[in-house]
Amino acid sequence: MQNTLITIALRGITVLPRMRIYLDMNRPMSIAAATNAQKTNQNVFLVAQKDPSVENPGQEQLEQFGVIAQVKQIIKGPEDSFRVLVTGLQSAKLESIEEYVPNLIARVTVFESEKNDEQEIHL
């Protein structure tokens, strides 16, 4: 199933499904994406950058796979930094970047979960 989602490029971190984590953000594009998603109650697509030094990554600078996540909380930090609490929901594949301004918008293919939430893996 394909979706179009607000996208946040992550530097130096990967978020996985079911993971809850605070992300430190200071890029205006990332802050705008998180704020827009929270205001409109939309999920976001989180995808790692191949090279963290690239300030405004295009599709070729992004990894092929990421995670759909929910923005739970945004906390204003010192200066222009923000801490954003996200929860990873499902894995997804980046198909294309549709827009770049004011934030990235990506078309992604969602991987349906094969595992029932009540199942556990025992080793």
Name each model feature, range by range.
Residues 1-123:
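N-terminal low-complexity, acidic/polar interaction/targeting segments
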